[in-house]
Amino acid sequence: MNLKDYIATIPNYPKEGIEFRDISPLMADGNAYSYAVREIVQYATDKQIDMIVGPEARGFIVGCPVAFELGIGFAPVRKPGKLPREVISADYEKEYGVDTLTMHADAIKPGQRVLIVDDLLATGGTVKATIEMIEKLGGIVAGCAFLIELDDLKGREAIGDYDYKVLMHY
């Protein structure tokens, strides 16, 4: 199945010069959505994953069904002020400044093998901050999986030597 057939490209959104890759058509098609989830599940199968971690919001959309299929838990990564209990945080650089991500301080147990799942790998700031928090909690990042990678933005460099899987390249 060619998953790119289920990605809408929106020119000049959210600002001039950006081509936004919209995964909504993929999610709206049960066969395409299921296929994408199964591809990530297949990638995770041999990695002995204990927990899926997904950044808000589209990491939830992709990560939760993967966790369900694997029969394991899911831990959300959120912006500050969105999680109700004690959190840890990591800052990451954006095009015009610094942003912060958080996760519950008890989300990952030391030694747990974690797969980070998100819809998009762009500059890599989100995944780099997520890796930092997982490792701060003693987790082992066993891999990262993305629906889409925007190759020109070189997010792969932020991942370093961590194993990763991408279903579509743009």
From Swiss-Prot:
InterPro entries: Ade_phspho_trans, PRibTrfase_dom, PRTase-like, UPRTase/APRTase. It catalyses: AMP + diphosphate = 5-phospho-alpha-D-ribose 1-diphosphate + adenine. Pfam families: Pribosyltran. Pathway: Purine metabolism; AMP biosynthesis via salvage pathway; AMP from adenine: step 1/1. The keyword Kinase does not apply. Its EC number is 2.4.2.7. It is found in: Cytoplasm. Catalyzes a salvage reaction resulting in the formation of AMP, that is energically less costly than de novo synthesis. Belongs to the purine/pyrimidine phosphoribosyltransferase family. This is Adenine phosphoribosyltransferase. The lineage of its organism: Bacteria, Bacillati, Bacillota, Bacilli, Lactobacillales. The gene is apt.
